[in-house]
Swiss-Prot record:
UniProt-recorded name of the protein: RNA polymerase sigma factor NccH
Organism of derivation: Alcaligenes xylosoxydans xylosoxydans
Family: Belongs to the sigma-70 factor family. ECF subfamily.
UniProt function note: Sigma factors are initiation factors that promote the attachment of RNA polymerase to specific initiation sites and are then released. This sigma factor regulates the genes for a membrane-located efflux system that confers resistance to nickel, cobalt and cadmium.
NCBIfam families linked to this entry: sigma70-ECF
Length: 186
């Protein structure tokens, strides 16, 4: 977890044109954004583009950033919007042209590793399959709170809702996920 006060200080400096400060924000949050994108089912070939597009949009919107609020949820809200945009684009393309991407058939890993790592990857792949069966709202809340590690107030800011609503959504999403996992024998 990153220190919010450091993020806000870096964001203020970046808003004044300090590229080094912005680079520090990229280093501090790039990996978590990439993991969130993967968790949302963004194909590996698009993950770096989503992260880059998110940071470009954040750079351009820094003047609108309210330094009284937390930077991380603000950034992840931009990232979620970029992921939704990609999903909509793919849905429209599939509807219009019937195009499916080769990335949809990617393997988790084609490099053999220790048995433990392979087993962990298989388990994660099963969980991700079940997670992808959840509705988008449930998937978003599980990924932000469980995978990214956001608190309920942070997730609320990222999703544009209240912390109480996040608490309810987390409970419902976990119940759905548990039911799917049990029915799938994962």
């Amino acid at each position: 977890m990153t220190d919010p006060s450091v993020d806000e200080a870096l964001a203020r400096r970046a808003a004044q044109g300090d590229q080094y400060a912005f680079g520090q924000l990229v280093q501090r949050h790039g990996r978590a954004l990439a993991q969130a994108a993967r968790s949302f089912g963004v194909p590996e070939s698009d993950v770096d583009d989503i992260v880059q597009d998110t940071f470009i949009a954040a750079w351009h919107a820094l003047d609108d950033f309210d330094s009284d609020k937390l930077f991380r949820p603000w950034l992840f809200r931009i990232g979620l919007n970029k992921m939704r945009d990609l999903r909509r684009f793919r849905q429209v393309r599939h509807f219009l042209f019937g195009a499916k991407d080769i990335e949809d058939a990617e393997l988790t890993s084609d490099v053999p590793g220790p048995e433990r790592e392979v087993s962990a990857r298989l388990e994660l792949a099963k969980i991700m399959q079940v997670l992808n069966r959840l509705d988008l709202a449930s998937r978003e809340i599980i990924i932000l709170t469980s995978f990214v590690g956001m608190s309920h107030p942070e997730a609320a800011m990222a999703l544009g809702t209240s912390a109480k609503a996040v608490e309810s959504r987390v409970a419902r999403a976990r119940a759905k996920l548990t039911a799917l996992l049990q029915s799938s024998q994962v």
